């Protein structure tokens, strides 16, 4: 895996010679000297400070950080105005090996592990550029296809997706069904060996740019429970009856295209069914822990970014004849923020280790998502406050981070639902 990561890093760095080997870190997959860990680091976003990562991961992280600095940050304001990113950046990300990082090499990936995928999630959060929907495409859509798709589906979609030529989305939410997934109305009825799909979806990330969409639909109205009558379908752009509605005007995530999708008598071949008929709800439940862990990791990474942005600001902003950082109330607030962030980072890193070992359960993933996204919003509020009036100005990065944070407790299952699921495991544990 180390060699594959180095090859992936060199794609981004544009080099031809492997970087010098660094001393190995003491972590779950390499021995050696102990790392500083986040609380002792000069900056929470420093490279080489967390025990779950190896020296090869650090090299890969440097290359990913370079990609976001050079290919994403300079264009993000332009994408915010357009309401979507360019297809060009998707293909650039594909060429650099940043899409489907943990996909096997023969399918176009670099064969990395979960930690490698997490590096891409985290570095996008550190860039404060929420536009590219890489994490949804790679961490969610591609996972469904590789884990539950047929060999033909995997060969057809995955190489194009890792190349950034086929953009993926997943369509669960409907105008009348959000967290209540069992209340969906979109349906697919059999017609010979084909399926006829009808319905609509809303709040679909990557919706406008999507080339393939995983659509959640009811396929058995007579099932003993709605959960036993749901299936997943792969709907491709250009299919007759597949209509992309308006891009939704959101409070945050300005550069991330979010759309309404409509399905009007779409005739789907049997090969469009993802996995087995009526097993869709089971697949969703199996994939949700990773989606919620992804949200948690992005949330704590965004919190680390906001803290560093604010630390820098208060150290140079002057008031009452000295920098704001010299005020005791500001110092105490910074101390609180760093403590909360470091404690949460330790928990999320533990969840990453559990998931890499295939031991992350649903309730723990819910705790990570709930806690980290709540913290992200709390940190955003306090960091804007510490910026004063300038924190309310759109040209300041903290303002963008503030509005982007608000959706985190909502998608992936609202935090109210997270508490329900956590409580259910506590009360009804057998």
UniProtKB/Swiss-Prot annotation:
Where N6-succinyllysine occurs, the residues are 66, 81, 165, 240, 254, 279, 322
Q: What is the effect of changing residue 291 to Q?
A: Loss of long-chain-acyl-CoA dehydrogenase activity. No effect on protein abundance. No effect on solubility. No effect on substrate binding
Asked if Lyase is a keyword of the record, the answer is: no
The organelle transit peptide extends over 1-30
User: What compartments host this protein?
Assistant: Mitochondrion matrix
Q: Kindly tell me the pathway this chain contributes to.
A: Lipid metabolism; mitochondrial fatty acid beta-oxidation
Q: Which residues form the active site?
A: 291 (proton acceptor)
* UniProt-annotated binding residues for FAD: 170-179, 203-205, 317, 328, 385-389, 414-416
Residue positions of the PTM Phosphoserine?
54, 362
Report which reactions are catalysed by this protein. Answer: a long-chain 2,3-saturated fatty acyl-CoA + oxidized [electron-transfer flavoprotein] + H(+) = a long-chain (2E)-enoyl-CoA + reduced [electron-transfer flavoprotein]; hexanoyl-CoA + oxidized [electron-transfer flavoprotein] + H(+) = (2E)-hexenoyl-CoA + reduced [electron-transfer flavoprotein]; octanoyl-CoA + oxidized [electron-transfer flavoprotein] + H(+) = (2E)-octenoyl-CoA + reduced [electron-transfer flavoprotein]; decanoyl-CoA + oxidized [electron-transfer flavoprotein] + H(+) = (2E)-decenoyl-CoA + reduced [electron-transfer flavoprotein]
The enzyme's first-digit EC class, named in words, is oxidoreductase
Question: Which UniProt keywords are present, listed alphabetically?
Answer: Acetylation, FAD, Fatty acid metabolism, Flavoprotein, Lipid metabolism, Mitochondrion, Oxidoreductase, Phosphoprotein, Transit peptide
For the modification N6-acetyllysine, the affected residues are: 42, 66, 81, 92, 95, 254, 279, 318, 322, 358
> What are the names of the required cofactors?
FAD
State a GO cellular component annotated for this protein: mitochondrion
Q: Does the keyword Flavoprotein apply?
A: yes
Q: Please give one Pfam family short name.
A: Acyl-CoA_dh_1
A GO MF term = long-chain fatty acyl-CoA dehydrogenase activity
**Record note on quaternary structure:** Homotetramer.
Entry-linked PANTHER family: LONG-CHAIN SPECIFIC ACYL-COA DEHYDROGENASE, MITOCHONDRIAL (PTHR48083:SF20), MEDIUM-CHAIN SPECIFIC ACYL-COA DEHYDROGENASE, MITOCHONDRIAL-RELATED (PTHR48083)
Give the protein's function. Long-chain specific acyl-CoA dehydrogenase is one of the acyl-CoA dehydrogenases that catalyze the first step of mitochondrial fatty acid beta-oxidation, an aerobic process breaking down fatty acids into acetyl-CoA and allowing the production of energy from fats.
What name goes with this protein? Long-chain specific acyl-CoA dehydrogenase, mitochondrial
Q: Which organism is it from?
A: Homo sapiens
Task: Point out the gene that encodes the protein.
Answer: ACADL
């Amino acid at each position: 895996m180390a060699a594959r990561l180095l090859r992936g890093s060199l794609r981004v760095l544009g080099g031809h010679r492997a970087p010098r080997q660094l001393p190995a870190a003491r972590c779950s997959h390499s021995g050696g000297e102990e790392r500083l860990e986040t609380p002792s680091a000069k900056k929470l976003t420093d490279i080489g400070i967390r025990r779950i990562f190896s020296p090869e991961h650090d090299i890969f992280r440097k290359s990913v950080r370079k990609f976001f600095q050079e290919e994403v940050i300079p264009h993000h304001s332009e994408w915010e105005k357009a309401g979507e990113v360019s297809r060009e950046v998707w293909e650039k990300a594909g060429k650099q090996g940043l899409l489907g990082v943990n996909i096997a090499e023969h399918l176009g990936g670099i064969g990395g592990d979960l930690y490698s995928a997490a590096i891409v999630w985290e570095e996008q959060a550190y860039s404060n550029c929420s536009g590219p929907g890489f994490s949804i495409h790679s961490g969610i859509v591609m996972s469904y296809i590789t884990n539950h798709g047929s060999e033909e589906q995997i060969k057809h979609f995955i190489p194009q997706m890792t190349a950034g030529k086929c953009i993926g989305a997943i369509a669960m939410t409907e105008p009348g069904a959000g967290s209540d997934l069992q209340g969906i109305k979109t349906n697919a009825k059999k017609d010979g060996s084909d399926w006829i799909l009808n319905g609509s979806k809303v709040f679909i990330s990557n919706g406008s740019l999507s080339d393939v969409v995983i659509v959640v639909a009811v396929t058995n109205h007579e099932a003993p429970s709605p959960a036993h009558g749901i299936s997943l379908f792969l709907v491709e752009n250009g299919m007759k009856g597949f209509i992309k509605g308006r891009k939704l005007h959101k409070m945050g995530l300005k550069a991330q295209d979010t759309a309404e999708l409509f399905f009007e008598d779409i005739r789907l071949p049997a090969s469009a069914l993802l996995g087995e008929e009526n097993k869709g709800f089971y697949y969703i439940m199996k994939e949700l822990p990773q989606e919620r862990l992804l949200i948690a990791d992005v949330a704590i990474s965004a919190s680390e970014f906001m803290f560093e942005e604010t630390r820098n600001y208060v150290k140079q902003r002057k008031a009452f004849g000295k920098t704001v950082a010299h005020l005791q109330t500001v110092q105490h607030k910074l101390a609180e923020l760093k403590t909360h962030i470091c404690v949460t980072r330790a928990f999320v890193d533990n969840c990453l280790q559990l998931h890499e070992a295939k031991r992350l359960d649903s309730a723990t993933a819910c705790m990570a998502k709930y806690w980290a996204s709540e913290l992200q919003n709390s940190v955003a509020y306090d960091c804007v406050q510490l910026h004063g009036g300038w924190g309310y100005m759109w040209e300041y990065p903290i303002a963008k981070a503030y509005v982007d944070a608000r959706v985190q407790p909502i998608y992936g299952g609202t935090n109210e639902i997270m508490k329900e699921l956590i409580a259910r495991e506590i009360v009804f544990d057998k």
